Amino acid sequence: MASKLSIDHEAIPVTALNCSFRKKLGLFLNPTNTVAADWRTVAELMDFTYLEIKNFEKRDCPFEKVLTDWETRPDATVANLLSILEKAERKDVISELKEILDDDCRKYMERQQRKPLQVPVVDSCGPRTQEREGITLYDDPQGLTPETFDAFICYCQSDIQFVHEMIKQLEHTEYNLKLCVFDRDVLPGTCVWTIASELIEKRCKRMVVVISDDYLDSDACDFQTKFALSLCPGARTKRLIPVVYKSMKRPFPSILRFLTICDYSKPCTQVWFWTRLAKALSLP
């Protein structure tokens, strides 16, 4: 059945490409090549900066990281990946891996065509398992009226003081917003990854990402950010809002570079900071 499907590469995200394709693509592009373009040329064509590329160089398999970061962008389609490889004059790679690539694309299309199994008594918009019932401080233990929030706050522990200031400015003022702060609102004893995905997707209208140097080293923040981006490719719903509250020594995360940020690190913009952030979180 899969072989009969015609492929529109423009409509298929790069996330559809499986591990075997990624590994083989890396085998072509990772080695430094004095004759053909390597991963650095491809990264430049993907619009990564010089500093980002220098950071990628520190990895054993740099192209895997390049592809992982690029695939969160709104233009990360299979068609654009093929176009970039052509611009890099690596048609040899396309020719060698085209069969594997198309096979992954067909499998993705098959999965998209399958109708999800729906049980009549289950509301797909609400919690679906016991693990997702009674997860926050003011949840209904039976899961009938789950607690909802205006925004999920993605932060690392070293930035908790700024989160306290955010609570003060957005919850205890005329803005009267309701924030989901993991350390304050989530009950202990639950799976961190499952609960975070439930809150971000089902319970919170938006997500605020507190960006700092320490954020870049946080596995939890990395998961939460990429999960939120996967829910709104291209930021069409203004779902994710990056916030910078102090100057950074390390490069701003490339996967968030296409989003408008709220910057508290510059004294000249602080006067507008809370009003802008509150307005963004108050949108329908």
UniProtKB/Swiss-Prot annotation:
Residues 102-143 are annotated as: Intermediate domain. Residues 24-101 form the Death domain. GO terms for molecular function: TIR domain binding; Toll-like receptor binding. The keyword Cytoplasm applies. SUPFAM superfamilies: DEATH domain, Toll/Interleukin receptor TIR domain. GO terms for biological process: activation of innate immune response; defense response to bacterium; defense response to Gram-positive bacterium; inflammatory response to wounding; innate immune response; monocyte activation; MyD88-dependent toll-like receptor signaling pathway; neutrophil activation involved in immune response. Keywords: Cytoplasm, Immunity, Inflammatory response, Innate immunity. It is found in: Cytoplasm. SMART domains: DEATH (SM00005), TIR (SM00255). The keyword Disulfide bond does not apply. Gene3D superfamilies: Death Domain, Fas, Toll/interleukin-1 receptor homology (TIR) domain. Residues 147-281 form the TIR domain. Pfam families: Death (PF00531), TIR_2 (PF13676). One of its GO terms (cellular component) is plasma membrane. The intermediate domain (ID) is required for the phosphorylation and activation of IRAK. Adapter protein involved in the Toll-like receptor and Il-1 receptor signaling pathway in the innate immune response. This is Myeloid differentiation primary response protein MyD88. It comes from Danio rerio. The gene is myd88.
